[in-house]
């Protein structure tokens, strides 16, 4: 754990009490029973995980990034409107409308523009998402989302988009380690 941070440690009491650790406790997620497989999103039992990813380094201005957040938010919120095959899941999804709008390329963005700009974009982005959720939820006649943002250790998806994964720096140097899993039957 001291070497690379693995395995991660999560405290359920903190998860249930806080949306963001920067903000006061709100206890919105008091029913959380666990997490999705990568622990990006707290979930109730039977709840689906609805994540969407944004790329900080693809934007030259905060206003442009906020525009991307709008469409990322709308996509994720729309997914919460779709029924699944399980009534238990549908009931929870309708109650929570939980989404996870995330940022990738965080470390590289901080290197490029500085930590204070990153913090500003994160705070402005969070506030923007909250405003969208309030307005669109009211317009749609549905509940506001119990959670709207996440820290998502993206991995392969971000690399395919040319970004560093999650909060990690882009691998540098001649060699780097990357864990890859595939089936024993795969011809690779």
Language model features by range: what are they?
Residues 164-188:
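Catalytic or ion-translocation cores adjacent to nucleophile or general acid/base/metal-coordination motifs
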Residues 64-68, 121-128, 183-187:
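Short amphipathic alpha-helical segments
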Residues 60, 118-119, 169:
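Short, solvent-exposed secondary-structure capping/transition elements
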Residues 4-113, 179-183:
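Function-dense linear segments that define catalytic or interfacial modules
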Residues 2-6, 44-47, 105, 142-145, ...:
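Short, well-ordered loop/turn elements at secondary-structure boundaries
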Residues 10-13, 52-57, 149-154, 158-162, ...:
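Generic beta-strand/beta-sheet core signal
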Residues 99, 161-164:
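Short glycine/threonine-rich loop-to-helix capping motif typified by GTGT followed
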Residues 80-90, 105, 110-153:
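Internal maturation/activation junctions in enzymes
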């Amino acid at each position: 754990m001291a070497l690379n941070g693995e395995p991660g440690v999560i405290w359920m009491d903190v998860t249930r009490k806080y949306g963001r650790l920067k903000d006061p406790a709100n206890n919105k997620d008091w029913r959380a029973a666990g997490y999705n497989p990568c622990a990006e999103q707290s979930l109730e039992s039977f709840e689906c995980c609805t994540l969407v990813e944004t790329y900080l380094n693809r934007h030259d201005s905060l206003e442009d990034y906020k525009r991307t957040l709008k469409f990322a938010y709308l996509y994720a919120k729309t997914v919460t409107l779709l029924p699944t095959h399980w009534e238990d899941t549908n009931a929870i999804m309708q109650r929570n409308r939980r989404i996870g709008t995330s940022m990738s390329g965080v470390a590289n963005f901080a290197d490029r523009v500085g930590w204070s700009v990153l913090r500003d974009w994160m705070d402005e982005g969070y506030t923007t998402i909250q405003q969208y959720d309030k307005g669109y939820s009211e317009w749609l006649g549905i509940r506001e989302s119990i959670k709207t943002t996440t820290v998502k250790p993206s991995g392969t998806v971000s690399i395919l988009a040319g970004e560093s994964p999650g909060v990690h720096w882009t691998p540098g140097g001649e060699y780097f380690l990357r864990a890859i899993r595939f089936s024993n039957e795969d011809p690779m």
